[in-house]
Amino acid sequence: MDTLLERFLRYVTFHTRSDATNPACPSSEGQLIFARALRDEMEQMGLTLVTLDEHGYLTACLPGNQPDAPAIGLIAHMDTADYAAEQVVPQIIESYQGGDICLGKGDEVLAIRQYRCLKNYLGQDLITTDGSTLLGADDKAGIAEILTAIDYLLAHPDIPRGDLWVGLTPDEEIGRGADLFPLDRFPAKWAYTVDGGELGELEYENFNAASATVRITGNNVHPGTAKGSMINSQTLAARFHAAMPPEQTPECTDGYEGFFHLAQMSGTVEESTLHYIIRDFDDDAFAARKAQLKERVASLQLDAPKARIELTLTDSYRNMRSQIEPHMHIVELARAAMLAADVVPKIKPIRGGTDGARLSFMGLPCPNLFTGGHNFHGKHEFIPLQSMEKAVATLVALVRLTSAWRG
């Protein structure tokens, strides 16, 4: 699997951090630079119908050798999260023997007391950061795994397969990855995002998601003469957040539990703004959370009638479970592929979202498969090489098993 490691180390050198403040697609030039390099690589590999559009969506096809087999797709994203992502310098810990891992030359440490999952990888080769950037396994590991699986299929033409479509997207990390996805040139019956975490993850449920902005306008006067006239919006903002349920936050929830998350807060005496994200798996509970926020805004407005309190709610994405359940064979095929690759499937909900969630509602059912990575979006991100190899083996098995499926 030297090609897999080489690919991944090459990919993470591309600076592809997306930019939520830029409405263009892609939101950063680095994503287009990376996409052009991947386009050239796909053409050199011999893939057909390789197409890169002006928005940075890259699609290609590995033609099948079984005419009656269903065409499927594999999808990954090219951007990285809103965290330091320039000049990524990975380090490789060969045959990890346990204990803390020093990241680079500074004081950053991948501590086993904090990341107990490290004990699962004794004797394996871990790819980490140098402590100054993220790694970019989310989702450059997925891209490397997809193309390495295709390399294997090209080298083993006796493996039965239907048409295999590849789709690489920009701006997934800022929630726009599916906005302009070219379904007209991606004729797969169903697809899989390769954008999950640890070895064995298989996901077909995700959060319902919304964002909420609470804007509070007060009245600023000289503090020496403020009695009876000043309305400090920051005081009201603090009161508003203090009334939110403290046990329903990201740091206090897991599994199928939803939450409110105060992502950003800013203010002056005159005006304060609170930005929340709202998450829940259950449709009714999700609706109740949005209703609860409306009630709290109305309650604070009654308590402070001279202030102006406004709420803006925006739905982001929905739980894809309802779109996958009529097609559960695609989950069972993925599960069988993992078992064929000696991987124990871990079926769990995604406490987040993927391009696949949006695409599932656009008519392309799209569960999520593991990449092998841990601690995405930060300097403690790492991925075991052996987990990446298992991802490749799973994808090859998935293509083979799907070739025999007839619905």
Curated annotation (Swiss-Prot):
Where does this protein hold Zn(2+) 1?
H77, D138, D195
Read off the PANTHER family from this record.
Answer: PEPTIDASE T
Name of the protein: Peptidase T
Identify the InterPro entries for this entry: ArgE/DapE_CS (IPR001261), Bact_exopeptidase_dim_dom (IPR036264), Peptidase_M20 (IPR002933), Peptidase_M20_dimer (IPR011650), Peptidase_M20B (IPR010161)
Gene designation per UniProt: pepT
Give the principal location in a single coarse category. Answer: cytoplasm
- Entry binding sites for Zn(2+) 2: D138, E173, H377
**Its domain of life?**
Bacteria
Q: Give me the reactions it catalyses.
A: Release of the N-terminal residue from a tripeptide
From the UniProt record, which GO molecular function terms apply?
Answer: metallopeptidase activity; tripeptide aminopeptidase activity; zinc ion binding
Q: How is the cofactor bound?
A: Binds 2 Zn(2+) ions per subunit.
Q: Which cofactor does it need?
A: Zn(2+)
| Assigned protein family | Belongs to the peptidase M20B family.
Which cellular compartments is it found in? Cytoplasm
Active-site residue list? D79, E172
EC class: hydrolase
- Which cellular components does GO assign to this protein? cytosol
| Organism lineage string | Bacteria, Pseudomonadati, Pseudomonadota, Gammaproteobacteria, Aeromonadales
Catalytic activity, EC: 3.4.11.4
Look up the signal peptide feature and give its range. none
Pfam families the UniProt entry points to: M20_dimer (PF07687), Peptidase_M20 (PF01546)
Known role? Cleaves the N-terminal amino acid of tripeptides.
